Amino acid sequence: MHIGVPLETQTGETRVAATPETIKKLIGQGHKVTVQSGAGIKASVVDSAYETAGATIGSANDAFGAELILKVVAPSDSELALIKSGTVLVGMLNPFSNETIAKLAEHGITAFALEAAPRTSRAQSLDVLSSQANIAGYKAVLLAAHHYPRFMPMLMTAAGTVKAARVLILGAGVAGLQAIATAKRLGAVIEASDVRPAVKEQIESLGAKFVDVPYETDEERECAVGVGGYARPMPTSWMQRQALAVHERAKQADIVITTALIPGRKAPTLLSADTVAQMKPGSVVIDLAAAQGGNCPLTVADQVVVENGVIICGPTNLAGAVAADASALYARNLLDFLKLVFTKEGQFEINLEDDIVAACLMCRDGQVIRKNA
């Protein structure tokens, strides 16, 4: 099959959907691969590296004219115009955007959005959300350290002792846990909160203190369990108690990193404007939910703002700041997914009996398969 790897043109996107490592494996399976010239430059992969792996370097028309296209994000309108009806598209296509999926269906594209893969052990190797969130959690701490006007670790010097930074992490999914681990390596004192009681042990195993907000009703306990590894919206009663606990700890914190997301919904508010107003001058907030509205109402996507002396950062693509490794991990995720849609003979086949394939299939034959509420 002819596989195309175009240059990502979305503003700020630095990643590429295939690396020489994964392309070599695809060619070894009998496929032909065309990479758009310059596609990997921002991820530290030059055209000659792709050629050495066996790929052909071509234009945007060449890459988008392939039978199967590997992308990082959904194609723009101008890119859609280059894609033929019947083409297969695989990438992070925003499965919760009805408008995006409808456009792909109108163009006759067979689209697979890997964000929709189930959170099961079998799907771990192609879990793009986890591979990219892991990087975002790491980079969030480094971004916080960059803006924080003090040291992170405790230092004892001849000029006196410097206290360790106090870090509060809200949301202990993949990004949150990596943020805990990274902040710990930098010598910070860490507290972390999450709606799911099951992560308490994980938080403590990384050296952080769990901010415990007890459940008072069966409804609260049921919602806290989550669905498919994701958090669910919590009842108002619990959110009010959690907000109070966060408020008190945020006032003492030097750095707050928020990571809470709910698939297909606006990000929950975890850090109120009133809380920010009472935080210490010079403290830093890194809002990893900025792309979905933010966990703090003062967050502005892709900007750094200062409110009452508090520095608030709203990055929407932190994984892209580590483009080389983010691309390498993402490309491996795609490669593992392609194993599910190619037969041993290298023929493309959609097996809807496979729960991963069925979950990721957004549209085919002009019809939207996944419909969001």
Q: Would you name each region that the model predicts?
A:
Residues G12-A17, S78-I83, G91, G229, ...:
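Glycine/threonine-rich flexible loop motifs
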Residues S121-A159, A290, C296-A373:
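Adenosine-phosphate binding glycine-rich loop
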